[in-house]
């Protein structure tokens, strides 16, 4: 590792007070929820934010498990904190939820929207963004689903902008004809002028949502307001997926300058086990590749832990590792003796095998 590499912590994220949106994502099973939860804790305890919100967009919703507290699609104050809130949302809405959206009450808009790929998920996401925008949060952390779902989520503003623009254009082009039909049907049904004006009212709602989407889209592309923290482990598939993620983020013009490498087995903690020694060598090979590929990134190394990180206190303790380089503790005397014993037994087995082979030749 070069001496002039960026600081190997997430302190830069905490110090950037202007940050509004922080996405945490990567391959499944690499520790995204633990990292995002701990980062949210670090932000809340930094003294630089009055209110922090963490949102899970992963259908698995591990956020409740991480904090040992049930969360819903409404922001809830996290136990043990005064300024940290959490909520769990599903970017894939069910039919009942879609029918509640204001724009969905116009059948013409609904049919048009249904012809645009991905618009249903994107509109649901826009409703969440609209809700969040009205709340007074300094920073919002997204605990995202695995990489493929995350990339689709980050593309929602673009999908929405194109889709809603089409709706507005089509509605405008056909407005006269649709207005006549609506007034006629409204009069026949006894709906009066209110029913006739409904399409225009709903179109106004769509245009208002389009304004929100454009604002969020612009913020996502502003490195002062948005950043993405990639989480991975030192293995081939995770390295490959991280590279793909970083490239896609560049296409979306979303800032990414921090990588958290999780589940590392440090040589100091091995204590002589052949299996762990082999694992350390394999991990080191991929760690070297990470540093070659991302020499201008903040790369944070986190250890493979003996226990799961669950509950507010455990997350507070783990959050310390995000803000300063992790220093592995040397093996205890008991661990060292056990490792030495394992090594001696392995050596004896090897010697016995050699003697048996020698006897077999005679």
Swiss-Prot record:
One of its GO terms (biological process) is tail-anchored membrane protein insertion into ER membrane. ATP binds at residues 27-34, 235, 262. One of its GO terms (cellular component) is cytosol. The active site is at residue 58. Its EC number is 3.6.-.-. PANTHER family: ARSENICAL PUMP-DRIVING ATPASE ARSENITE-TRANSLOCATING ATPASE, ATPASE GET3. NCBIfam families: GET3_arsA_TRC40 (TIGR00345). Homodimer. Interacts with SEC61B. Belongs to the arsA ATPase family. This is ATPase ARSA2.
